[in-house]
């Protein structure tokens, strides 16, 4: 009876360790291509915008034994005045060649036509190779855009692998 109880407890401990989430934190810099706005004529400064950006991790983290490297994000925003509701995807690459996809959404602000920062939540929506079955998510927060249009984003969260 004691051996069976010990085996059950050991199995539960191994299962809990295997599914435990690992904290991650990093910093990403993105530079966007010119946006594609479509005005909505119901009120001033109302539009839908699609933006594509190339991004590099300036403070990378590791997942599955490899370091995050770079990626591309595609953002769809509904702008109303100086605020926007953002939704998008980030397709990222690892130094070892595996890839991952992130879905995100949040709110951004602008001032004088330039990004004044944004924040929101994100979650992994896929992965390849060692990242197959990747799960997790977290929050992000961006600083106002630099003079050259580069946006720096702090990303924090957690992940787990099967």
Say what each PLM segment does:
Residues 1-7:
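Bacterial N-terminal signal peptides that target proteins for export
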Residues 10-11, 43:
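Extended interaction regions within the primary functional domain
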Residues 11-19:
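Hydrophobic h-region of N-terminal signal peptides that target proteins for export
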Residues 20-162:
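Beta-strand-enriched cores of mature, soluble protein domains
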């Amino acid at each position: 009876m004691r051996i069976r109880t010990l085996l059950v407890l050991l199995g539960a401990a191994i299962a809990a360790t295997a599914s435990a989430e690992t904290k991650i934190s990093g910093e990403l810099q993105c530079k966007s291509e010119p946006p594609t706005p479509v005005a909505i004529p119901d009120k001033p400064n109302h539009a839908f915008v699609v933006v594509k950006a190339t991004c590099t991790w300036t403070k990378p983290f590791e997942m599955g034994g490899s370091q995050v490297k770079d990626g591309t994000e595609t953002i769809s925003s509904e702008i109303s005045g100086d605020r926007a509701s953002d939704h998008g995807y980030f397709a990222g690459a690892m130094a070892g060649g595996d890839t991952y996809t992130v879905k995100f959404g949040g709110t951004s602000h602008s001032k004088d036509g330039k990004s004044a920062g944004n924040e929101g939540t994100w979650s992994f929506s896929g992965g390849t190779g060692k990242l197959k079955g990747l799960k997790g998510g977290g929050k992000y927060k961006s600083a106002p855009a630099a003079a050259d249009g580069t946006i720096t984003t702090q990303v924090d969260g957690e992940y787990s692998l099967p």
